[in-house]
């Protein structure tokens, strides 16, 4: 991840990378919703796995901007997930709301951990530190 900058000062390349990842992510999300219906669970779990994988790879700030923040950030959706839970709650279906929240959290955490560990396996081993 790039180092935080004061205020909202951004580099043009950083903006372009995030936008270049966000557009296909949002379009994919839209198409998945059209063809699969409301599949927040599937999309969020797959997005968590991909983001975990990317984060487990050797550091590459530009890749993280493009694919992590841009693509994964726009293909996954926290707000739609919460709205689905609220709809269950407003219908009086507490079990479905809590089940959706618990299932998404559990599967999402597991998917992120799996992706992260897979990404770390591709990372070259660190050279041993010599005692000084």
Swiss-Prot record:
What is its subcellular localisation?
A: Cell inner membrane
UniProt: Na(+) binding residues: 73, 76
Any one Gene Ontology MF annotation carried by this entry is: metal ion binding
Highest taxon, organism lineage: Bacteria
The membrane-topology field of this record reads: Multi-pass membrane protein
Q: Which reaction does it catalyse?
A: fluoride(in) = fluoride(out)
Show the Pfam families listed in the entry. CRCB (PF02537)
Keywords from UniProt, A to Z, are: Cell inner membrane, Cell membrane, Ion channel, Ion transport, Membrane, Metal-binding, Sodium, Transmembrane, Transmembrane helix, Transport
Any one annotated GO CC term: plasma membrane
Primary role: Fluoride-specific ion channel. Important for reducing fluoride concentration in the cell, thus reducing its toxicity.
| Family as reported in the entry's similarity comment | Belongs to the fluoride channel Fluc/FEX (TC 1.A.43) family.
PANTHER family referenced in this protein's UniProt entry, alphabetically: FLUORIDE EXPORT PROTEIN 1-RELATED (PTHR28259:SF1)
Specify the protein name.
Fluoride-specific ion channel FluC 2
Originating species:
Synechococcus sp. (strain CC9605)
Name of the gene encoding the protein in the UniProt record? fluC2
């Amino acid at each position: 991840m790039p180092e935080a900058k004061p205020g909202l000062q951004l580099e043009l390349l950083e903006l372009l990378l995030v936008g270049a990842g966000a557009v296909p992510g949002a379009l994919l999300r839209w198409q998945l919703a059209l063809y699969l219906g409301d599949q927040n669970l599937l999309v969020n779990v797959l997005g968590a796995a991909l983001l975990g994988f990317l984060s487990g790879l050797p550091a590459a700030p530009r890749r993280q901007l493009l694919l992590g923040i841009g693509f994964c950030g726009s293909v996954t959706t926290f707000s739609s997930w919460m709205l689905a839970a609220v709809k269950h709650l407003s219908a009086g279906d507490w079990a479905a709301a809590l089940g959706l929240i618990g299932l998404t959290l559990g599967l999402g955490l597991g998917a992120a951990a799996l992706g992260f560990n897979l990404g770390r396996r591709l990372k070259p081993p660190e050279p041993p530190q010599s005692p000084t």
